[in-house]
Amino acid sequence: YNINSIALRYFNPIGAHPSIKIGELPLGVPQNLIPFVTQTAAGIRKELSVFGADYPTSDGTAVRDYINVVDLAKAHIAALKRLINKTNKKSFEYFNIGTGKGSSVLEIINTFEKVNNIKLNYKIVGRREGDVIAAFADTTIANKELNWKTEISLEESLKSVWKWQQKQSV
């Protein structure tokens, strides 16, 4: 059939659109850290649980790669252009889409508190079964082949997601 495709393997999307009209609103219990952070800051949740502080990381908490949703959207556009322009090298390609840098749970909490001037109520609890120590993207191939890289900082992402959460609370 001569069908070409590209799969984007993204890591942890965070942030909100700059208009603050689009953001993450999980129904029920969130499955990601950032909604727990914002909902705790907004008073929707009493306390944020940090699962494990005994990992072999800089502060003992798990590490993940957090990518802004706008950077993620731009990666999709870059992949589509590659297909439209027929510059793909194989009929099926895949790319890691992330920042290439890991941030620990406590780094996320501390950065969120700092950039938004708010204190979070959190506690350290035991590890969750199945959680890995660290997961972050090697974006070397995506950077080169898609001519794409992230532009939005963790700080900007955490500011935007808090602005979005506050708008939901109004």
Task: Label every PLM stretch briefly.
Residues 33-170:
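C-terminal substrate-binding subdomain of Rossmann-fold SDR/epimerase-dehydratase oxidoreductases
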Residues 17-30, 37-40, 46:
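Hydrophobic, Gly/Ser/Ala-rich alpha-helical and linker tracts in large acyl-processing enzymes
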Residues 1-19, 47-51, 89-90:
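Conserved beta-loop-beta element that borders a ligand/cofactor-binding pocket
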